[in-house]
């Protein structure tokens, strides 16, 4: 037996070792534990954190951490790194990992604005294999892919997303966006939709759309109809939480029409244009518009004088064109608001913008009791009006170079740019993807080029080519030499708007690199369509010069602005332009032959003034529905200058009537 002193000393030496072991064991037990990677859940960490886990994890968890890292890289806008990481994923993924990879691939393509590239991976996804969190991302991507292209698929995605959202704010946002998506679908498409028997929520939404369109001009009737709809569809999300804009529409009151100020130039070069607008406005206001009592029938050719050039600052197509054969108007949308009723009680006071500054006239009009101003007409005066910060509601009769979104201002213009934008939509809807612009070598040509190309880019199109032509003498020289016009050109230089990151359905998409081409459809250098801005004398030379260089097998569509549309040219002219489509206002396309005859007589068949007369008629209707145009999305007017609608800046867009030369006749455009 050892002495007690020895035992005591040994015990003293052992205690620190035991304490150290216990402390070490305690520290080991309290060390942070890394949770397992869950690709079906949220990814709240940074890409650096997930990449570190990739380096430290075993092989069986490495792929999951890689997928989370890719999602974080996308969230941070690091698209090149995310793309590289996607290519480094192994081929032998399990089903959960495969579904996540497809989601990430679609997300990457959406972020790169390659929407077509996002469609294929989304089609391969098995929705039933996704977690609820993944389903949210799936429907967000479906909506993002359909941005700018209204369709029932986008609406279906919004409908499917709604039950997965828990926040009341998110649900309201969903309902508002579902409603906006519905409003953007063309009525022709609505009429042909096929709804599955189990799509009760979607059917309810479509019925609500019908309720809105049938009662849009009567707030009290709209309110009653919505209440009836809520009774019929008590479980529809919108029955419990109406779209915000629909709630506002129920409480919207027409603009005050007690006294209207007309701001027009009553002297100088623009006086003739102002007189035409004023006459159209007064005729509509006083109820002296001729109306056709029978269906429009083809009218005989009308000989008209040469065009009277207009002031370049005035928003009017610079040529005088004529109506030949009456053309049936295109089908109207369901929101069928036509020319406003006349009003004897409305006072009209005209202010001369050529004699006093616009700022002073606006103040004077307000002091005189006006509640709405129509005008000014010249671009320079519109800029001055904006600088005046007037409190009056204003329907400007031109569009400034830099549009400002003001709650009391709308912009209504007739211009070559307006026609060019409509042409871009018409040609896109006809399946054309590689247009060439054939325009005069003037500032007019430059304006048309920029307007068309900018609109084409918004639609998802690739680079637009342009070719300019000179005088009629130059064209004659070209046709005499047999040179023809080759369908080639130089790209229109449209400076893309600086894009910022956007959030769609809760999915944040970082801004793409500045040198990226957003979702463009490549033309591969082959032109499939030509938009021509030319006078009658120029067009009769240009059309055969194009025919010299192409064959009928090339299937190149030819389109033109109203600049070349004249009736007095006779059957030879119409035969020479066989197949050419052209646009014009409904009034000049046979929508109302009686009013057309009245206007043509008043202006001695000067059709540039007839268009401005129609603009005055539509200005009266727009004044009566100013609040609706300014505040109700989807509100449309069947006007004499076109089907009128407004964008978010209250720029009045015109959908024109397209006609076509066919066997010496003028028929509706195909």
From Swiss-Prot:
Transmembrane segments: none annotated. Gene3D superfamilies: 1.25.40.650, 3.40.50.2300, Tetratricopeptide repeat domain. Residues 1-26 form the signal peptide. It is a lipid-anchor. A lipid is attached at residue 27 (N-palmitoyl cysteine). A lipid is attached at residue 27 (S-diacylglycerol cysteine). The keyword Glycosyltransferase does not apply. InterPro entries: LpoA, Peripla_BP_I, TPR-like_helical_dom_sf. Interacts with PBP1a. HAMAP family: LpoA. This is Penicillin-binding protein activator LpoA. It comes from Erwinia tasmaniensis (strain DSM 17950 / CFBP 7177 / CIP 109463 / NCPPB 4357 / Et1/99).
